[in-house]
Amino acid sequence: MNKKKILLDFRKKLDEINYLVLYKEICGSVNFMFNPFQTEAAVVSAINDLPMELSSLMKFFVLGKAIERDIIVEFMGLQLVDNLVMLGLIEKDNGLLQLRNYVIVAYKDFYLVVNKPPFFFGGTSRSEDVYIGPDSYMLANFLPHRHFDKCLELCSGSGVISILNAQNSNSCDAVELNSHACEVSSWNCIINFADDKVHLHHGDLYNPIQSECYDLIVANPPFIPFPTDLTFYPMCGAGGELGLDIINNIIYGLDQHLKDNGMFLMIGEGVKNGDNIPMAALIEEALNVGYEIDLYIHSVENLRTHVVKMANFCRATWDNETPKNIEELLLNMHNRHDMTEYFQFTLIAKKIYKNKRTHFSKIKLQRERSIEGLYKSNLDKCEIRKLPNYYALYQGDDLIASVDEDVIDLLQKKDLDIIEYACKICDERNYDDKERSEFLEKIEKTSKDLIKANLLKKIDEI
């Protein structure tokens, strides 16, 4: 079986139906470059508007649906279908064919085979799944557009970052602990003509590459803070109680594997309490000599808010395995470490100083991305800017808060309904009497200020 020929023939078939264009239209022009997946309902609605044969093909590729064998064979040919079955990309089921728990994501001019997301019908989330998400796209957008001799990607997953790096480098090493992801990323490298430059390694972080050094090292590691005794969360996400279990080993290995004048780029999420940032403390300890480091902190939110989101996600994805008291377990974990806030980060480190103390900057890009940030604002002086996924409120160059559709809906409820809605939030977050009183006071003041400032009218005018 010639794997390379089979996968390149598969790509030709996707090209024949202009899959890149169709995927972009189906997923929406904004979502297409921000998130690999639109909601299933939105995808189904868009696909149903296509001609019948094309609609069936897009259900097969975008949603991973089982489709009549004759339709797929007519499109791809019997030989290619049989070859893809032998390869493990397609499976047979009583006269139907479907991708084997995969979907085909289109990004820029690439085709990526990844596992069907858990929020699609029939999707699952397992430790061996090949993950791609908004964080993958965020890292892709931050990649430097200049030539590198040798690149290394740690926790390479689907291989998309190494495929991108291959365009601007002589060679790329990609390391992944998940053996299934290694196999699928080898498919993706072939499909996207990167297999001659990208060298895949199955193993744990730096172990497979031994003493090799690189001009660029990038990583999108497991970073979700999660109780270590709860084992249902997949290894592609869970990062230990502070989210630093994997990150710690990556940071401490940089000195050995990053060349002089080399660059390190990593994205992730973390927890903090004001200026007590475990992620920053790790960096200061491990990289105290020879580096220029910028840690960009953004999308900060109250940990209670994050806990509710995480608990709901766990129930929706692993309902049978999620403990009923998941919120309590998550809050207890964060309380053990005295953490109060959740954030996203981008870390850029350049190895440019010899025998000089590291210059380390912590840069907070925005304050809060929720209605709780609004009450701090002088709304009469705010400028409202429409961004792809939310409305941003600025005072000068300072982002005060963001307003998404949920907040717009809340504001439209007016007076009493707003307080009822706020009480529901308090219940979800298990606020005590003092926290409840303070939160309700903030929301009540915010609602009056927003109505007074005609915020809804201003948003409608954008």
What is the predicted role of each segment?
Residues 53-101, 140, 399-462:
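Long, charge-rich, low-complexity alpha-helical segments
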Residues 149, 170, 215:
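Conserved acidic residues
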Residues 2-42, 47, 71, 83, ...:
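S-adenosylmethionine-dependent methyltransferases
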Residues 171-176:
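Conserved SAM-binding motif I beta-strand of class I
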Residues 93-166:
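SAM-dependent Rossmann-like transferase core, predominantly class I methyltransferases
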Residues 124-135, 145, 177-325:
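S-adenosylmethionine
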Residues 305-375:
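Flexible, glycine-/basic-rich loop-and-beta segments that form/coincide
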Residues 1-55, 95, 100, 119-121, ...:
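Acidic, low-complexity/disordered tracts enriched in E/D and polar residues
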